[in-house]
Amino acid sequence: MASPTLALAQSPPPKSPAVSVSQRNPHCWSKLPLDLMQLVFERLAFLDFERAKSVCSSWQFGSKQSKPNNQIPWMILFPTDKNYCLLFNPEDKEKLYKTQHLGDDFAKSIVLATYRSWLLMQPRYEELEDQTLDQEFHLYIKDLLTCERINLPAFESDIFGLSHPILWIDDKTKDYLVIGTINRETMVSFKNGDNSWKKFPELPKSSCTDMCLNMIYKDHKLHYLDYSNLYIYDFFGEFPREAFRISVREFVGYATNPYGYDEFPEVPLKLKLNRYIYNMIVTVRGDVLIVASLHFSMAETWEFIICKMDSSKVNKWEEIVSLGDESILLGLGITVLAKDMEGITCNSIYFTADDFYEDYEENEIFIYNLDTNKVEIPHQFVSSSIPSAHARWFLPTFKRD
């Protein structure tokens, strides 16, 4: 489809209609060749794409052969106990879009991961029939715009299902890959064509001191982070193969303030670290970053430390204070180019606390500007009016009709 089947959930009062481009100049724009028109449409973001469709009937027809070139992160909100999502586009802050009905079991599920417009869904723990150890979990993948669904085979887990989840899918071929851990020592994957979940034979074993902190998958490589090392595994063969590792003890130990623990009662409360998250990022240019997100007691917002890997130096990690013309989508493990692009804040971190087992808090999904060290909550009008169970940033993919 040329744009998602979305209904407006909220919008401002209608304004007086403006004179359209076709009324001002009825001959020039309507007679563009279709191939040239498609070149125009393929360069438009969602909002401009929707505006261009209304220029004239020939542009309306041309839009059906194209799709928006969306590079702007949107926000998904999951209203409590509802079988649909709400989508917020920062480029058009006055509107909120509602998806189609996403299935009777959608409200009873949690989203583990996203890839473009695809969601990796798992039943809520309280919805399981038998809440015991070695519980069986049935996951599925859902396109929130087309409602296409892919069911995955069941697996048993002695924790709350799939942890450190990764979803990757090719929109054209529908090839997909799901990765995660099902206990402290076992990592599994499933891809199209498999009959069951496969265990990884060579990945590092977690322990109390070296448990997995974060995983991301990009360009057929799995990046795995624990308290000691960052590992990179190639996924070009039948089984993953370790291609690279680098110590992270210097950075991880530095960023995680020990004052967060009770054995330091003399430390003022405001200096105690009560929560931290580590994320790996692969930038547009291919650099590998680690972002430490830190929340101190009595602090109004989170703090961030960013380090860049440089394996050519003795000191392998270098702290950086600017992303230049890029912005980080923390939960997706990537950066996007943001310079001169309306709707996205340059040199910023698009942050989500990303804990689907905790209650949703509207102040834990925001945009952190590294230039000003200030937080922007662009969706505040939404959060105040619609109770939500969860929210996260994503990059939607729009399809042709």
From Swiss-Prot:
Q: Which protein, by its recorded name, is this?
A: F-box protein At1g69090
Question: Which residues belong to any copy of the F-box domain?
Answer: 27-74
Organism name: Arabidopsis thaliana (Mouse-ear cress)
Query: Which residue ranges are recorded for the region named Disordered?
Result: 1-23
Q: Tell me which Pfam families the record gives.
A: Beta-prop_KIB1-4, F-box
InterPro entries the UniProt entry points to: F-box-like_dom_sf, F-box_BR-signaling, F-box_dom, KIB1-4_b-propeller
Q: Which residues does UniProt call coiled coil? A: none
Q: What is the lineage of its organism?
A: Eukaryota, Viridiplantae, Streptophyta, Embryophyta, Tracheophyta
Membrane-crossing ranges are: none
